[in-house]
Amino acid sequence: MPDFLGRSVYLTEFEKQKAPLAASPAGGAPVFISLHIGEEFGPGYADRARAMCRWLSGQGWRILADVSEVTAPLFGLDDAAQLPEALGLWGLRLDDGFSLDEACALAARMPIAVNASTTTPAQAAALAAAGPEVIAIHNFYPRPETGLDPEFLQESTRMLQAAGMQVYAFIPGDQQLRGPLYAGLPTLEAHRGAAPLAAFADLAVHYGVDGIFAGDPGVSPYEQAQIARFCTEKVLPVPVELEPAHRGLYGKVFTCRPDSPQGLVRFQESRAYAKAGPPAEPAGCGARLRGTVTMDNRLYGRYSGEIQLVRQDLPADGRVNVIGRVAPRYQLLMDCIQRGSRFCMVPPSAKEAADAL
């Protein structure tokens, strides 16, 4: 599972990105930049790009630069192999203009990345054998409806990993989206409009990628904090709007019972917690729609106090209280809770809570 959220930095957005990047502990995480976006070229381009790279390196980010055959001459260099030393880069992401032989030669000297969607099994094997750190990165897709299908992402990721390569992908941001479309920059079309935490967890749990970048310039501090907790503690935070009487459940770590059915997440520890207080009285026994958090009341006998997260619509039951709901943009997270895995309920962001009113 990835242990970081990489970021994407754009020369045209850099001044606006500096403050939030400075506030985010880099810790050696990678940052993705592009050094061949034609619309950014102009007077002073090389100097501005150098200054950006110096600043990012000084903040502790490892810079992975997307380059083409025209990049080196822009900086007065003869060869792409000179770029890391000249600009303080960690590695190069090579566009499709580089031959396999050129890519293998570079891989022997530095970390490189290639296009995960176009690399064949034979090419992947050759590249993985050429150097110690070779990554395949899936593209991000600015235009709605053009992102990858789940099946293609799974199949290509498995193939590349089997050949010995690491595989990275992109999730959308939730602040300062990248123009001109401002529709998010995900790899997977299903993630367009999803919260960064939800998209990150989905890629990590269901697709097994080795690294994840945010494609858009901005990720809110709330999302960064939840992703960081998932990476470091291996506890999945699930933003839930709980009824006031049950907000003491926020932050408690639960385990999904190993025998949970597909349509429910059963909170393994919940009945033990409930024994510390009086039995739950019937209240709010409404329809149990997908995303509903429920607690069995005293009418369910020994099950009183059991908490469940509902993954498929169920009818109302007088023995079951509705005590909360997963915030809409995070419902993808429910499917990321696997049998035996740990998770916790957290308050939604202030913006999410306001939008729900």
Question: Where on the chain are the PLM-derived regions?
Answer:
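Active-site beta->alpha loop and helix N-cap motifs at the rims of alpha/beta catalytic domains
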Residues: P2-E133
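N-terminal start-of-chain detector that recognizes signal peptides
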Residues: F4, A65, A108, F140, ...
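Residues in well-ordered beta-strands of folded domains
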Residues: S8, I137, P239, Q308-V310
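Short secondary-structure transition/capping segments
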Residues: S8-V9, F75-L87, A105-T119, L160-M165, ...
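A broad, low-specificity signal for short, low-complexity segments enriched in glycine/proline
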Residues: C53-L56, F75-L77, P172-Q175, R266-Y273
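Electropositive, surface-exposed helix/loop patches at the edges of structured domains
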Residues: A65-A81, D96-C104, F152-E155, V205-G215, ...
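Catalytic alpha/beta core domains of metabolic enzymes, predominantly
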Residues: S117-T120, A124-G248
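C-terminal functional modules
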Residues: P244-L357
